[in-house]
Amino acid sequence: MEFPYRAEGRKAPDRAPKLIASVIKEAERYAGDLGCEPDELAFGGRSMGGRICSMAIAEGLPAAAVVLLSYPLHPPGKPERLRIEHFPALAVPSLFVNGDRDPFGTPAELAEHIPAIAGPVEVHWLEGQRHDPKPDVDDEIIEVVGRFLSGL
C-alpha cells in the first residue's frame, strides 16, 4: 500500500495514529478483496512501513504474522530514542530482516530489545548491508521471507 501522504506528494509522513489507521483500513479492504479475514494474512513492510504495520497489529489488527524489513529501531545516532513501546503487545510471529550495518539499529541493539516482543521472533541479518539493502541480496530476502511464511 502507499501511505496517503505519499500519494498526495508530501515528503513528511503523517503522525503515527493516522498511518496506523491507514494500514488497518487497507488491511481490512485487502482481506475483503481476497474473501478472507485479516488474521489469515501476514502484513509487513520496509522501515517505517513495517514499523507502522507492527504498531497496527499491536493495537489490535488481526494478523497471522508480521514481516519487518529494515526495522528502524531508533533514528541513526540516537539509540536513546527507541521505537519499541509497542513490542510487548506484538503477539504474532515476527520476522526481522535487517542489514548488519544498519545505522537504525545494530545486531546487539536489536537482540537486546527483541525479548520484549510477546510472540515468537525470527531474525535474519543481511551481511554487509545497511538500511537500504543492495539488489544483490533480493534473492536472499525472498528466500528468508518465503521460508518464514511457509512455516506459519
Regions found by a protein language model. Name each.
Residues 129-142:
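Catalytic histidine-centered segment of alpha/beta-hydrolase-like enzymes
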Residues 116-132:
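Catalytic histidine neighborhood in serine/cysteine hydrolases
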Residues 1-40:
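Serine-hydrolase catalytic machinery in alpha/beta-hydrolase-like enzymes
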Residues 100-105, 131-132:
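Acidic catalytic loop of the alpha/beta-hydrolase fold
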Residues 45-53:
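Gly/Ala-rich beta-loop-alpha elbow adjacent to hydrolase catalytic centers
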Residues 90-91, 96-98, 102:
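Short beta-strand/loop motif that positions the catalytic acidic residue
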Residues 62-74:
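A conserved short beta-strand
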Residues 40-45, 69:
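Short beta-strand immediately N-terminal to the catalytic nucleophile in serine-hydrolase-like folds
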